[in-house]
Amino acid sequence: MKKNLLILVTSTILLSMGVGLTYGGPIKIGICQIVEHPALDAVRNGVIESLSDAGYKEGSDVIYLIANAQGDMGTALSIAQNFKAQNVDLVVAIATPTAQATAEVFRGSATPIVFSAVTDPIATGLVLSADDPSGNGNITGVSDLIDVASDLRLLKELDSSIKRIGMVYNPGEANSNRLTEIAVAKAGEMGLSIVKAMADSTANVSIAAQSLIGRVDAIYVTTDNTVVSAIDAVVAAAEEAGILYLQADPTSLKFGPTIATGFDYYQQGILTGNVVAEILTGKKPNEIPVTYQSGAQVHLNLDAADKIGFVFPQSVIEKAASILYGGIVWEREETE
């Protein structure tokens, strides 16, 4: 097993409240994420909080095995194999690469798998159908499929002169490949073009981002785990070029992109925890349809915009869920 395999074992009480499955001892739940960054950390925390809110209290009735693959697919496979060797009762796999590794290792097993923050579970072969996951293993979960077309329209709304959009992505991530394909198709319909810059590791993100300088009018990064883990490199390239940078991850706003869009990943974790609770109380994964999170929001970074001399249109400011200004994130107050 690789040295960078990190497993932290903690314990929590999981009360079955007299219904559902009966376990001969503490329930063991393996939770693995592909890398450490705020969005995936928020998912993990949301899962645990959801179970707590459902009445599953901390103690000795459940053991969480929490692991981080540090961006390495081989390590993700090793983690899944370790979970299997420890006879976990359920696995929560956070992000597409982790879910793929877990599904491969547990293929043919009765151990339930619940994925989270997976872009396209059908295209990546995790399930055969969103409404009926049966037929492809003991797996279901929650997707964070983003609206790529909406993001591209937002860039055009921000600056009508934008024609070429650079996308930094890891071709080794199935989720990124899928979203890049969608972006190319949607951009063509809008009179835009996509310029690809590939980075197969965090070490290569800077080179990929720098290659876009002078070639594009804006940068767009989707839910790519590799690139988000090296977001500073993309921010630096966008600032040097003096162009907008839209990141499809709200948790990344404070790190410097001009715009961040997408879902509340803590809520993604809450939804995932709800699925886990259903399974622990007796439902089979193939009886639970895949959940697609809704309610994507727009977040603006005025500090980043100031650095490139950009002023947000009032129409966009009015629909922003939050604005970062003066180093402080200002949340929009909800009105009845």
Name every feature range the model reports, one short phrase each:
Residues 2-9, 18-336:
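Short hydrophobic alpha-helices and adjacent helix-cap/hinge residues
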Residues 12-13:
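Repetitive helical segments and hydrophobic/amphipathic motifs
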